[in-house]
Amino acid sequence: MLKCDIHKYFYSIDHEILLSKLSHLIMDEEVFRLVKTIIDSTNLDYVNQELANVIKRRKRYIYHSNINEREKIEHLARLAKIPFYEKGKGLPIGNMTSQILAIFYLNDLDHYIKEKLGVQCYIRYMDDLILIHYDSNYLKKCLHEIEKQVHDLRLSLNEKTQIYEVTNQGFPFLGYRFVLRKKRLHVLLLSNTKRRILRRLKKVADNQKYDFLHQNYFGYLLPADSRGFLYEMKKKRLR
């Protein structure tokens, strides 16, 4: 199995290439100008300044919070990984259009992998790609070709990209672990996914917001073997 991950994907999407792709799709000039304004908003100076302020405030909050040292280190490590925007690069984080544009940006790569490379077992969500094949040499060839295509998009693969054998431990993807046992697929939750969910719920004090967030996670957890974790969430809610 080949698992690919793109380095700082949301912050690295090239405006020029993205707008060129969109120009063949969006015929309405007014709509195109609006989309261009949204995309180019990351070029504004105040964006990085505000991002720096948010990180600074968040660090201050973490230092003075009552969470244990391990959680503090984890939070600070995540903050340290947040990059700043370069001119002509990146999509505004949190914007609904960014989700759609991020999926669209690699659309041609999807077709290349399926139609040119002939990969039958292929999955992608945003910048997480998985190719499954019994021949590792074939996957090496695919990786070489994918690297070239990604480079043409002014992106790069990160260190998480690798080819490895699918064992009885399965493989992680989108917060789950997929395991094949006795010809049956089991979907398990990763430990860090559980911690992230519980940490998020712990922060919510308002009952209405808690219930809304709980229902959202319930939908996410349904595909997985998660009855035990759902019970744990319920117990924490009752406290």
Where are the regions that the model predicts?
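Secondary-structure transition/hinge residues
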Residues: K114-L117, R154, A205
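Right-hand nucleic-acid polymerase module
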Residues: R78-G88, N137-K140, L157-R239
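A common structural junction motif
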Residues: I26, E147-L155
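Acidic/proline-rich low-complexity IDRs
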Residues: E50, D152-R154, R237
